[in-house]
Amino acid sequence: MPSPSVTQECYPYQNEPTWSKSEKVIARTAFDVALGRELHDVIQKAKQLANEIQQSSDLWDLEHYLTERRKEIDRKYDYRYSQLTHVFGRLLHEGRVSEEELRGLREDKLKPIRSFAKFLAEDTAA
């Protein structure tokens, strides 16, 4: 029977899929592109809000918007491999990443990504 340390080096978590080098490249690229798209949207909205500032309360509304979006983005974009299938599932559901951009990932990753996106779609529809 192998020692626990040997088993942990091969499979850190029993149910966690392993990511090949090529999958890591695909995942990092898709992750960065999706994050860039979301940050672009935040920048556009912030510019719009800044242009509409008429009084001091509008300034604090902009600050509140930016703070909330930063918190949301920090929670959403978690690049731990143990979290990536959920991250990509959510991004797929939101339209921030496409299945085409995930092409090259093995089915053991694509299946839970699609499943989570479908779950979120059904949950939103309910």
Predicted regions located by residue number:
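Acidic, Ser/Pro/Thr-rich low-complexity regulatory regions
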Residues: P2-A126
